Amino acid sequence: MLTLTVLCASLGPAVFAQGPGSSSSAGGSSRGGTTGANASGTQSAVPVAQQQLYTSTGANGAQPTQDSFHGSIIEGKSTGSNLELSLDDAIQRGLRTNLGIILQTSAQKNANGQRLEQLQALLPTVTGSASIEVQQVNLAAFGLKFPGVKPIVGPFQVVDFRAYLTQNLVNVQSLENYIAAKHNFQSAKLTAEDARDMVVLTVGNAYLICIADASRIEAVHAELATSQLSFEQATASHDAGVSPRIDVLRAQVDLQNEQQNLISATNQLAKDKLALARTIGLPLDQPFTLSDTAPFAALEQMNPQQAFERALAARKDLAASAEQVKAARAGQTAAFADQLPVARVYGDFGDLGTTPGHSHGTYTATGEVTAPILQIARTRGEKDVADAQFETARARLSDQIQQVNQEVHDSLLDIEAAARLVQTTRSNVDLATEELSEAQQRFHAGISDNLPVSQAQAQTEQANNQYISALYQHNVAKLSLARALGIAQTNYKEYLGGK
């Protein structure tokens, strides 16, 4: 390190800048430097937030969200009375209590703290100290011997009250480190805003799952009533000697199968309601019912390229990744700036004497320029690290742009396919119901046994399951499109309503 120091002294008070140091008893100052460090940013993964829809016959292929968005902090206590929970209420609760938002908000505070830490390297630093020192010196120990003079001096005391100031005048590395930290903070802020879209998608999806479960229970109740009627008809026909006992057994098996389906569907709804409560911060012992339904509502077709361009402008996670690239670029400059000279001033001013009443003002003022002379390995190492971080951030941003493009296209394809599925499965429900009615009439008239009735009941159950699943998939696809476009928080009603 090559150091150029200019020492200034005068009798009057002076104000120079920066740097905590410790003074000697004679009023000298010690030099302090501030070295910036690269602030680390917060990376945010953006998965497709679709939970699994379980039915008694299987599960669709929906992908789960990050675990943090399935948790929350509890808001309030259970009232003991039933709560009517609308989709709007659920989303607003989620935006207040969801763990994903809370963690992202904490990450934003952390990034802001790192930004302020880096900012301090560019601002004046003032510290103060007060000391009292009592000494007794043996001059002979230092080889000082004078005839007629006692070698022991003291005891005497020194009182020192002093303030220290330090200021960087030119420090490019600290400046670039602050710029990087500022971009990291902006990235964390955008990521926290993006988390709100994720919460809307997660809570909305959990609510839609519960709606699908409730629809499944309603369908099973209808199927159970049909099975009960078929069992009674088979029993009456057998008692009248018209049909064999196998018809009664077949009808009884169908009836008990539906009873099992009802138990499973009811249990699944209870579990999915617990999952919804966990997502929005409701106490798990708080009873609630869903006050909204999700009927089919077609969404106006959208041009994929226009939708992608809209997503590029609105997605907060993309903007956050762009800030990460800027932060990494500033990190490259900071790594290079480690080779540059640093200019700073520092000094101190205070009262020095034997007692506060017998003291005098003293100060020092120093200007300093330091520059590295030989640190080849460190310089190259810092450059390689900064280059790698920049290349990584840039590659992730490029990939994320394509990921958003894919999410937009996937959502549009899912909406189109699910809309056709809803129409087809709705028709299947009508046809299966008509077939069941015909089979029941033929059995009641004694034209055939109840095997066609049993088969028609199974087909009706399958058609209802497929219709419920298709309706759920259509609504989730619309909600996913709103998320892919970066407008889930503000436009989810429009997309679920199909306007």
Question: What kind of feature is each model-predicted range?
Answer:
Residues 105, 182, 245-254, 450-458:
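Short, charged, amphipathic alpha-helical segments
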Residues 83-86, 125-195, 304-310, 314, ...:
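Small/polar-residue-enriched beta-strand and adjacent coil segments characteristic
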Residues 244, 404, 411, 449-450:
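Alpha-helical heptad-repeat coiled-coil segments that mediate oligomerization/polymerization in large
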Residues 1-53, 136, 466-499:
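Acidic, low-complexity, intrinsically disordered peripheral segments
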Residues 120, 257-282, 418, 427-487:
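Short segments within alpha-helical structural elements
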Residues 19-131, 137, 284, 291-325, ...:
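Bacterial Sec-pathway N-terminal export signals of envelope proteins
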